[in-house]
Amino acid sequence: MASKLPSVLAATEEEIQLLLAAQCHIGTKNCDKQMEPYVWKRRADGIHILNIGKTWEKLVLAARVIAAVENPNDVCVISARPYGHRAVLKYAANTGAQAIAGRFTPGSFTNYITRSFKEPRLIIVTDPRVDHQAIREASYVNIPVIALCDTDAPLKFVDVAIPTNNKTRHSIGLIWWLLAREVLRLRGTIPRTSDGWNVMVDMFFYRDPEEVEKQQQEEAAAKLAAQQGVETEAPAGLSEWDVSSALDWAADPAPGTTTDWSAEPAAAAGGGWGADTGTAGWD
């Protein structure tokens, strides 16, 4: 089936390779009835494979919807899934949107008394199943919803579904990166060239805080070692240690230094233990 997009918006070979490398086409064993049009086939092990062509078509459609919002701050990006926290924050920093990374506070769209109250014109969620609270509240106040949907995702109250794998860090980060780049292109902020945007896709990938801390410690230790010129070799003085001066524990003991423990004890200077100790004058 030929793409319905104009040639200028069609996916390039490099973009298709990125989607395949990030495993955006890998679905789940379960498949929602409304997600069947986006499924290409089902593997022998039961995993559904998504159609990458339709993924790109819906991604461009979502970008055109986002670019139609005059004020970028009226777009709210949401991710309760940890793998999407860094992606939505980077997307918001590059496009000017609002970001909610982590738990969505109930009432953020409906209860104007709360401190986290927002009135966006459009919301984008990472997973309809995890971000169900935000989608439900958006339906109460007529806010359109764009969602990254896997094969098992419910499409209730979702207006634009981007079929993709929303379970792994690389697929989530890549889709958010492609979406941000396409939005900036449609707004005219960056040119439509391969090197028009200098933000790497790695910046959108989730990173484990423990791995980041360990990497920072290793870099700091390496920098300190380079500054101080620490030598990894052992000091030369240790190799010249005179072994002959050490005690020879295997040699015979020196004469006169042993004691015969089986011999009778020597008599005390004042006599035996039973001798009079001269206590007569105590009283």
From Swiss-Prot:
InterPro entries membership: Ribosomal_uS2 (IPR001865), Ribosomal_uS2_CS (IPR018130), Ribosomal_uS2_euk (IPR027498), Ribosomal_uS2_euk/arc (IPR005707), Ribosomal_uS2_flav_dom_sf (IPR023591)
Gene Ontology biological-process annotations: ribosomal small subunit assembly; translation
Molecular function, one GO term: structural constituent of ribosome
GO CC annotations, alphabetized: cytosolic small ribosomal subunit
Pfam families, sorted: Ribosomal_S2 (PF00318)
Source domain of life: Eukaryota
Localization terms from the record: Cytoplasm
Record keywords, A-Z: Cytoplasm, Ribonucleoprotein, Ribosomal protein
Subunit architecture: Component of the small ribosomal subunit. Mature ribosomes consist of a small (40S) and a large (60S) subunit. The 40S subunit contains about 33 different proteins and 1 molecule of RNA (18S). The 60S subunit contains about 49 different proteins and 3 molecules of RNA (25S, 5.8S and 5S). Interacts with RPS21.
Job of this protein: Required for the assembly and/or stability of the 40S ribosomal subunit. Required for the processing of the 20S rRNA-precursor to mature 18S rRNA in a late step of the maturation of 40S ribosomal subunits.
Family: Belongs to the universal ribosomal protein uS2 family.
UniProt cross-references to PANTHER family, sorted A to Z: 40S RIBOSOMAL PROTEIN SA (PTHR11489)
Name of this protein: Small ribosomal subunit protein uS2
Organism of this sequence: Laccaria bicolor (strain S238N-H82 / ATCC MYA-4686) (Bicoloured deceiver)
